[in-house]
């Protein structure tokens, strides 16, 4: 990243005062989140996904923010409907989904109170061939392991596509916050 002109900073953002030492930024791509391995430490999920987000939102309230979110804050919908749209009411189920909505609400707060331009970037699974759902299924096929097919559909987009779209979203950020579902146009089973 340094060779590309990206200035990196290593910090434990949960430590008091650390956020104040970070430089101002015109644009913030907010990708902080705790998802996997949170069973038994749900307090940590809430701390990182909501409390820390509130601190970061306050610190960078003068920036344009693209905040990664998740489509799992939507209810399950029949496959034939094409899935949730940005107008679909949220119905988070479970600790992670609730904290994901909490993260959005922290950015909604600064967008509404301070005029911060925010885009809530909702996606489910960004995949590529080295990891993710495609890799998991391919590995099971290769190893002859059983594949759980109880969930017949999943919302997946290519990781490279997600990166390109996310960087273009700074120009779409608004106050109040804008929502963008990032998903493919077709349903494949």
Where are the predicted features?
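NAD(P)-dependent short-chain dehydrogenase/reductase
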Residues: 105-161, 167
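Conserved cofactor-binding/catalytic machinery of classical short-chain dehydrogenase/reductase
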Residues: 48-52, 64, 102-103, 158-161
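Mid/C-terminal beta-alpha module of Rossmann-like enzyme folds, strongest
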Residues: 165-189
């Amino acid at each position: 990243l340094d060779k590309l002109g990206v200035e990196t900073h290593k910090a434990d953002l949960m430590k008091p005062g650390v956020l104040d030492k970070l430089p101002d930024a015109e644009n913030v791509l907010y990708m902080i989140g705790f998802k996997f391995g949170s069973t038994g430490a749900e307090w940590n999920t809430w701390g990182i996904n909501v409390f820390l987000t509130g601190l970061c939102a306050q610190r960078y309230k003068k920036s344009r923010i693209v905040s990664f979110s998740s489509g799992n804050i939507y209810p399950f919908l029949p496959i034939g409907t094409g899935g949730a749209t940005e107008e679909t009411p949220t119905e988070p189920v479970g600790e992670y989904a609730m904290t994901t909505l909490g993260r959005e609400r922290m950015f909604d707060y600064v967008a509404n109170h301070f005029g911060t331009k925010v885009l809530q970037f909702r996606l489910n699974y960004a995949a590529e061939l080295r990891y993710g759902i495609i890799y998991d299924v391919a590995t099971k096929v290769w190893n002859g392991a059983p594949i759980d097919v109880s969930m017949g559909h999943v919302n997946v987009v290519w990781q490279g596509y997600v990166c390109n779209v996310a960087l273009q979203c700074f120009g779409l950020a608004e106050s109040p916050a804008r929502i963008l579902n990032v998903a493919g146009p077709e349903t494949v089973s």
